[in-house]
Amino acid sequence: MPFFSAGFDLAAYRNLLMAYHGFHAPLERRLSPFLAELDQPRRAKAPALLRDLHALGLTPAETDTLPECQMLPAVTCEASALGVMYVMEGSTLGGQVLKRVMAERMGVDQASGGAFLDVYGTETGSLWRGFLLFLDRYRASPEEQARTVQAAIDTFASFERWLEAREVLL
């Protein structure tokens, strides 16, 4: 994981966030027609990534032209949207650890490029539990359950391929 690499500096962090934005922004657009009851706008990560990139020195013109991932997982129904969201929502838990690492190593906080790492702030736990509760109550057929699982697997794989292609994994 880049965050723990000895060569990981502020420039590498900025490049990593650029790649994260290139994955999250188009994927969030793809998710937007599904699962309105989960308050997709509240759960969006791309706005926090933009704030971080601007805090780290990128201009709006530069962030408007960032490359976006074209190898996204398919989101064709609520079941696949849930699989994608499982990965994206779960990452907020890891962000809680990474925000402390970035604060200690580079002095990054909410205002200076760390908003994405703490995107839900004190609501991280409750939003994660709310998502799990929704997932638990979702009545899915065996085929839909398989789509949810496959979408989660595809999201992990797509994200890793994207980060490798952007050459941000140290």
Describe the role of every protein-language-model region:
Residues 1-170:
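Metal- and O2-centered redox machinery and metal/ROS homeostasis
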